[in-house]
Amino acid sequence: MQCFPRKWELNTNTVAGAGLAFMPETQYDDRHMKRQPTRSKAVTHERIVDAAARAIRRSGYAGTGVADIMKDAGLTHGGFYAHFPSREAMLAEAADRAGAAAVATSASIIAAAPPEKSLQYLLRAYLSKEHVADVENGCATAALCSEMPRQAPEVRRSATRRIKEMIDLVARQLPDWGKPRAHEQALVTVATMVGALVLARAVDDGRLSDALRKAALNHLSPSTD
């Protein structure tokens, strides 16, 4: 069963390179030359955001420093403020990037599943032993939710937007999709998924960790076994 693999994370080259095709490479007029620094800056910006998105999942918001991020991105500390007005602005983009990766991964798992089993596939992947172990490449909400109340408004806003997307994605997999109770079911499902993952990662008892995630899985989708 698939977990949350690194290959489904947002691809920096794809994002940063999306605008490179707007002007054919055969045009070398002044406009083309003037745009090169802007494009180079955009690519560098994406590298920083990707490094920060990995770091916040690995070390948390409090453990993510500007110097370490720039080093991880292969850049000097002094260039940071050419891309962000503050550390909080970087964290907001990182939270958005990490949250988007989790939603994209979930959507990919659902797309690969038979329609009638899409939620089961997602639950089994999300609550897998592999996902418990893979904090750096896993769900950003589970990795960071305990720190969220202490973050700047722009960071919380970015994270909240992606949480809402996950809730909506889950709601669309429910048999009652389109009815008022589907949204409530989705809220309970996502809260249980995330809470079980947080606890399974928190404890130092392997048996308890397995019991937590399996209990949540059986509660949310009893027919998966």
Tell where the protein language model's regions lie, with residue ranges.
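An amphipathic alpha-helix adjacent to DNA-recognition modules
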Residues: A42-D50, A62-G63, G74, A82-A107, ...
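Hydrophobic alpha-helical connector segments
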Residues: E93, A107-G138, T189
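Hydrophobic/aromatic-rich alpha-helical bundle segments in the mid-to-C-terminal region
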Residues: A152-R161, Q173-D225
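Solvent-exposed, amphipathic alpha-helical segments
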Residues: A51-R58, T105-S108, T192-L199
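Basic, helix-initiating cap at the start of DNA-binding domains
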Residues: C3-S59, G63-D72, A89
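An amphipathic alpha-helix signature
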Residues: V49, Q120, K164-A171, H183, ...
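Key DNA-contact positions within bacterial/archaeal DNA-binding proteins
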Residues: G78
